[in-house]
């Protein structure tokens, strides 16, 4: 048994199965994820596509009508709303330096996938998105913190994030660590004080979900195993350990986002569980695609340092499985995520269906 294995436990029952499936192919109307800071976001045009085309036809036909969904317009609307909420939730105040460091990473742009999943899940189960917006903003604060700390020299040591210098390059390592702590505190404060329209029980459940996301059974647990396994001079890892790392570092964030939105929207426990499964598959899909892009795109195209994990000797999906198998795995995860949405209102499910396609076929 390797030193990595002793840290592992199953994140959810049953051993995941990755079978062969069709080769990853581009959408007829794909979106490029060209996201800029809060001053604006831009997409390619022609991003309206049929909801029924976004899942495999033999699974989607009984459920999804051939309705046109304008994903470009949806994303622009939600990103704008989230950016405005973040700006309002974290104004510059004393001490100015720490607030500037917090805002630098929080408002630096990005895909805003976690807050959008939160809002979409709330809407899917019949809730009011305004109820979920404080939690959506809090999730992005937590995500920003994780990226700030992930880039530190003692962690993954990256000087570039979203096409700009990483937080510690601009503000120094000490300020970055403290700004990350402050973002966590602000996230929970914001949920507790700004959430309206639901009872305290639901708010407490959301706070519990986000606390678990951050802790030893979430992002921290994944990062600990990541630091101990697969790097230069470390033990080699297999698919099970690699999956553990990314279920915790990446998929856990998407899962907490979906569950928070669903809880605030009044979902049943059965609906919450399906959205958990959706988000685990979508989160792993994001990481598999990220690893593929890391070896097929330049740093300029990605907005972060390309090929750094491979250069450091870390294990990635293409390194472990090869490019072809990694693409097959991505296609299967995409299908598994979308299958969890069968049975929901197809019109309300359209954003989450389209989001999985976007994750799968993005180019940065």
From Swiss-Prot:
CDD domains: Trans_IPPS_HT. GO terms for biological process: response to herbivore; response to insect; response to jasmonic acid; response to salicylic acid; terpenoid biosynthetic process. It catalyses: isopentenyl diphosphate + (2E,6E,10E)-geranylgeranyl diphosphate = (2E,6E,10E,14E)-geranylfarnesyl diphosphate + diphosphate; 2 isopentenyl diphosphate + (2E,6E)-farnesyl diphosphate = (2E,6E,10E,14E)-geranylfarnesyl diphosphate + 2 diphosphate; 3 isopentenyl diphosphate + (2E)-geranyl diphosphate = (2E,6E,10E,14E)-geranylfarnesyl diphosphate + 3 diphosphate; 4 isopentenyl diphosphate + dimethylallyl diphosphate = (2E,6E,10E,14E)-geranylfarnesyl diphosphate + 4 diphosphate. Its cofactor is Mg(2+). SUPFAM superfamilies: Terpenoid synthases. Residues 1-51 form a transit peptide. Its EC number is 2.5.1.81. Induction: Induced by jasmonic acid, thus triggering sesterterpenoids accumulation and reducing feeding and growth of the herbivorus insect Spodoptera exigua. Accumulates transiently after salicylic acid treatment. It is found in: Plastid, Chloroplast. It comes from the Eukaryota. One of its GO terms (molecular function) is metal ion binding. Strongly expressed in glandular trichomes, and, at low levels, in leaves, stems and flowers. InterPro entries: Isoprenoid_synthase_dom_sf, Polyprenyl_synt, Polyprenyl_synt_CS, Prenyl_diphosphate_synthase. Isopentenyl diphosphate binds at residues 72, 111, 143, 162. Monomer. Belongs to the FPP/GGPP synthase family. This is Geranylfarnesyl diphosphate synthase, chloroplastic. The gene is GFDPS.
